[in-house]
């Protein structure tokens, strides 16, 4: 019978197969038709309806009917030397991660308590890296989709919970929320994994800058590397030595702030938690350094929104760093206190409801994205591999409209999408 073989570039060709042919036989057939220099059988990967076909299975077992199509991809060659194989261990982990050690990038939002993805400022800040400018696109078609979450690559960085983290169920939720953040000894391995993933596309300083902008979230850092690092992250933070064990941490020096409206009036910037300046902290050594946040209506509203939708914490912290950098530095210095406060139960509604609405109004909304005719065809080809349109759109735009990168991600994480 006749079947069609499609490539990621949009071309296709036909071959003759038998229902009892194994996948290995089909690969050899493609090699003989197209040439060993173009499609060597050993490097071929065949996909049908979103699933990679195993070599030992047959065409009939995989339900490949006459005049149907399969998608062909080429596996990358692996280094043969032992030294090279040990050095590439981080790369293989970055490309394919078992579901037991990583969380799907596209998953329902269920945890009620979250951890703060806050990274301490490095003592040796790297110089700013140029932000890549996306090429202009001719607008011919419109696809309406929400702004995608970062999904170009999932790098698992298991971060242990700090001693002050809640115990029991809250601790479990914290572990889930923190599993995608790199910290401590895992940070260096995460940097190396991203460098290996890029294959020389980025230098180390650029990767460190992207991680700092993403508060050590590897997924968001990779997204920044493809789409551009926010300008706010390109300003190196001030290097600060850690506070000694016998002395309480002092808050950073206060910069002069403009006169603010009375406390009873509305706050024009809901994410500027203290428009009149930070209160005096550290007066009570027995209390948490950030306990003064409890009295802030803006923080109460932020906490309610984060507990309802944990994914808004990242953009909120980025905006907070712009509106109130002094408070952001204080949070970075006292992450455990911030985690404890952000996970405390929300009490009452009252005025915090209005502030919640103000914050929600400032969050990104679904927007119309223009695509060209070629990009629309690329989206349709990804759909033809057996994936849902919504998932294809999210991955395609998160991968900066790189069809091959999107296809690789979809195939590497298809077991997560099936769940």
Swiss-Prot record:
PANTHER family: UBIQUITIN RECEPTOR RAD23C, UV EXCISION REPAIR PROTEIN RAD23. Residues 185-228, 372-413 form the UBA domain. Residues 288-331 form the STI1 domain. Interacts with 'Lys-48'-linked polyubiquitin chains via its both UBA domains. Interacts with RPN10 via its ubiquitin-like domain. Residues 1-79 form the Ubiquitin-like domain. Belongs to the RAD23 family. CDD domains: UBA1_Rad23_plant, UBA2_RAD23_plant, Ubl_Rad23. Keywords: Cytoplasm, DNA damage, DNA repair, Nucleus, Repeat. One of its GO terms (cellular component) is cytosol. It comes from the Eukaryota. Residues 83-172, 235-282 are annotated as: Disordered. This is Ubiquitin receptor RAD23c. Disruption phenotype: No visible phenotype. Increased UV sensitivity in hypocotyls, specifically in dark conditions. PROSITE patterns: UBA (PS50030), UBIQUITIN_2 (PS50053). Widely expressed in the whole plant. GO terms for biological process: nucleotide-excision repair; proteasome-mediated ubiquitin-dependent protein catabolic process; response to UV; UV protection. May be involved in nucleotide excision repair. Binds and presumably selects ubiquitin-conjugates for destruction. Prefers multiubiquitin chains rather than single ubiquitins, with a binding affinity for 'Lys-48'-linked ubiquitin chains. Acts as a ubiquitin receptor that associates with the 26S proteasomal docking subunit RPN10 for the indirect recognition of ubiquitinated substrates of ubiquitin/26S proteasome-mediated proteolysis (UPP). Involved in UV tolerance in hypocotyls, specifically in dark conditions.
